[in-house]
Amino acid sequence: MSASNGEIVQRIESLLASAKKLQGDDQYGRFGLLKEIDLLYQDVEPPINTFFKQWTSLTFFSCIDIAIKLGLFEHMKGRESITAKELGALVNVDDDVIARVMRVLVASRFVASKGEDAYAHTHKSLVYVKGEHTAVDSFNLISLLAVSYITIPEYLKTRSADELVDIRKTPYACAYGMEGKTFYEVLSTNPDHLDTFNRSMSEPGPEWGMFPFESLRENVLAEPERPFVVDIGGGKGQALLRIQEETGKVFGTSSQLILQERPDVLEQINQDDIAGITKMPYDFHTKQPVKDAHVYFFSQIIHNYPDHVCQDILKQAAGAMGPSSRLLIVEAVLPAQTDVGGDMGAYLIDFVGLAMGGKERTEKEFATLLGTVGLELVKVWHGKARHHAIVEARLKRA
């Protein structure tokens, strides 16, 4: 039921009050304000407009995809304005097509209009220009995944529940005609697709500071001979560098920080860039060679796989843990009840998992998964925003 006129006025006044409370660059406050605005918009818009908005979103996505892949945003960079004809000549595409794409982007206030068929960047479109701290690589990855999104309805109608959790029969693999290969094997068949994935993974990760590593000082000082943190599948060591910084280089002890990754990943890392960190080739489906570390650390790994694969990964770590070892899993933790009007990030990533064979989990689902490999959930350390969290687990107590 739509909100009444009186309710609309009251909520706008509430929005105004919230806006007046904002101080400086208060990102969390702005996020809360956006949530209120979005909820009001949904209550005011007529039902048929929901379809129109979805149609608009699909077309908008397609136009951004075209602009990125043709290099339009790159050619616009550094110019006060550029015409459709000039862009068309630069990318060898009919200028009428360029104009039609740009109309959608201008109407969405994403690109600025500088006269008839002339355009310029806005602060929003610049986010899609190649470079550090931009969204272009993540967008390109979602564009690859979108191919499988379109095929999921037919996949679900024709496949069994067991096939959905078979990592060699994912919607992504089937959409690209490569059933029998895992998501990562499909990616590896196309160097451009693999490069897109690797680039998107190097973009800013989850919120930091959720788990108090400083609280482990006493334990580490008491037993410095034990490895401090084993980062399993830790990429280029970004997390260990942050932990190193937070703990004053492991509280001044000789306790190790160990980065475990595939050999090909480790070969790309200059040891000088991760001073004080030990590189160790490792496949997390095999027996964990480092025993009784203070912390075993997984960041953005577990959500890439269905439960039966996660059990195989986690039992390797559990088999190496000592009585006081901790297992930390950096993941989104979904609320037990869906958060209406809140941040969509975790739900969007969960749908990515549906396509590629993984999933996001609730606290209850994490507890169940951990229990199957002899671990127990101790605590979920939540971040300030969104659904970012660290799941802490230990060996089950007798």
Curated annotation (Swiss-Prot):
Source species, domain of life: Eukaryota
GO MF annotation list: O-methyltransferase activity; protein dimerization activity
Coiled coil: none
InterPro entries per the UniProt record, alphabetical: COMT-like (IPR016461), O_MeTrfase_dom (IPR001077), Plant_O-MeTrfase_dimerisation (IPR012967), SAM-dependent_MTases_sf (IPR029063), WH-like_DNA-bd_sf (IPR036388), WH_DNA-bd_sf (IPR036390)
Pathway field: Secondary metabolite biosynthesis
One Pfam assignment: Dimerisation
Signal peptide: none
Binding site for S-adenosyl-L-methionine: G233, G234, E261, D283, F284
Practical applications according to UniProt: Hypothemycin is an antifungal agent that exhibits excellent activity against Peronophythora litchii, which could be helpful for the storage of harvest litchi fruit. Hypothemycin is a strong inhibitor of a subset of MAP kinases such as human ERK2. It can therefore be used as an anti-cancer drug thanks to its inhibitory activity of Ras-mediated cellular signals. It can also inhibit Trypanosoma brucei kinase TbCLK1 which is a good candidate as a therapeutic target for African trypanosomiasis. Finally, hypothemycin also has inhibitor activity of T cell activation.
EC number of the protein: 2.1.1.-
Catalytic site: H303 (proton acceptor)
Disrupted gene: phenotype observed: Leads to a reduced production of hypothemycin but an increased production of 4-O-desmethylhypothemycin.
Transmembrane segments: none
GO biological process: methylation; secondary metabolite biosynthetic process
Class of the enzyme per the UniProt entry, highest EC level: transferase
Entry keywords, A to Z: Methyltransferase, S-adenosyl-L-methionine, Transferase
Function summary: O-methyltransferase; part of the gene cluster that mediates the biosynthesis of hypothemycin, a resorcylic acid lactone (RAL) that irreversibly inhibits a subset of protein kinases with a conserved cysteine in the ATP binding site such as human ERK2. The first step is performed by both PKSs hmp3 and hmp8 and leads to the production of 7',8'-dehydrozearalenol (DHZ). The highly reducing PKS hpm8 synthesizes the reduced hexaketide (7S,11S,2E,8E)-7,11-dihydroxy-dodeca-2,8-dienoate, which is transferred downstream to the non-reducing PKS hpm3.
Family of the protein in this entry: Belongs to the class I-like SAM-binding methyltransferase superfamily. Cation-independent O-methyltransferase family.
Protein name, as recorded: O-methyltransferase hmp5
Source species: Hypomyces subiculosus (Nectria subiculosa)
